[in-house]
Amino acid sequence: MSNAITMGIFWHLIGAASAACFYAPFKKVKKWSWETMWSVGGIVSWIILPWAISALLLPNFWAYYSSFSLSTLLPVFLFGAMWGIGNINYGLTMRYLGMSMGIGIAIGITLIVGTLMTPIINGNFDVLINTEGGRMTLLGVLVALIGVGIVTRAGQLKERKMGIKAEEFNLKKGLVLAVMCGIFSAGMSFAMNAAKPMHEAAAALGVDPLYVALPSYVVIMGGGAIINLGFCFIRLAKVKDLSLKADFSLAKPLIIHNVLLSALGGLMWYLQFFFYAWGHARIPAQYDYISWMLHMSFYVLCGGIVGLVLKEWNNAGRRPVTVLSLGCVVIIVAANIVGMGMAN
C-alpha cells in the first residue's frame, strides 16, 4: 500500500472522528430549542466556514464561481440539497426505530448507495468487476457493511440491557424513513462526484491538491443549508412551544455560552468534510468512490470508540462491548482490504 493511499485512509479516519464527536458541544447547550442550536451551528458549518476558507484559497472568489455554467453548478447544489433532506430524516429515523437500529439501517444504505452508485453513474462499474483491485475494493465494501451490522447489533444489545427504547417506536414508518435517510444522505457523495469540474478548476488556479475540493463546499453545503435552515426556521415560526426570540432573551452569559458551543459543534461538523477532502485527494482517481465507504464506516467505528471513552457502555455488560469491539475490528479489516485493492 502506497504512502498516498495510507494517508488518504488516515485523513478519512480523522474526518470521521470529528463527525463522531461533533454533537458533544451541542449536548452542553442550555435552555435553547434544538432548532435554534442547530441553526447557529449550521450557519457556522454550512455558510461561514465554506465561504471563508474558499475566500482564502481562491485568488479571485467571485471570478471562480462565475466561471461555471448553471449546468455545472445546479447538480452540485441539488445533490447538496438532497443530502440536507437525508440529514432531516436522520433525526426522525432515530425517533421511530431507536439509535442503534436507525443508525445501522441508515448508515448501511447510504454506505452502499453512496459508494456503488457513483461508479455506475460514471459508467465505470466494470472496474469493480473486471479488475483485481476493483474486486478487492468491492469485497472491502461488503466487509465494512458486515462491520456496521455487527456494531449495530452491539448497540441493540446495549439498549436492551439498559432499557433504552425508541421515543415513538414504529417499525413501518421507521424503516421507510431509514431507507429515505440512507438514500438521500448519499447526496454528499454524488455532489462531490458532480463537483469534479470545480475541483479541476481550483487545481488550475494553483490551489494545493489537498484543498481543491473545499471551494465546491460553498455550493454543496449551500444546498444542504437551505433545507436544514428552512426546516428549522419554519418550525421556529409555526410551533407554539418554540421561539427564537425567547432563546435570545436569556441572560447574556448563557447566550454567549450557547453560541460558542453551537459554533464549536458547527466547526467540528465542518472539519469532517475538511479532512474528507484531504483523504479524497489521496485516493487514486479510479477508486475515488471509495472515499464515501471509508468515511461512513469510520464514522461508525469512531462512534463506537467515542461511546466507550465517554463511558456510555459502562452499564451495558460484557457481551455488548465484546460485540462492539468485534465490529470495530471488522471495519478496520475492511479499510485494509480496500487499501490493498486500491494499491493494485
UniProtKB/Swiss-Prot annotation:
Keywords: Cell inner membrane, Cell membrane, Membrane, Sugar transport, Symport, Transmembrane, Transmembrane helix, Transport. This is L-rhamnose-proton symporter. One of its GO terms (molecular function) is rhamnose transmembrane transporter activity. Uptake of L-rhamnose across the cytoplasmic membrane with the concomitant transport of protons into the cell (symport system). It comes from the Bacteria. Belongs to the L-rhamnose transporter (TC 2.A.7.6) family. It is found in: Cell inner membrane. It is a multi-pass membrane protein. The keyword Membrane applies. The keyword Aminoacyl-tRNA synthetase does not apply. InterPro entries: L-rhamnose-proton_sym_RhaT. One of its GO terms (cellular component) is plasma membrane. It catalyses: L-rhamnopyranose(in) + H(+)(in) = L-rhamnopyranose(out) + H(+)(out). The chain crosses the membrane at residues 4-24, 38-58, 68-88, 101-121, 137-157, 175-195, 214-234, 259-279, 290-310, 323-343. Pfam families: RhaT.
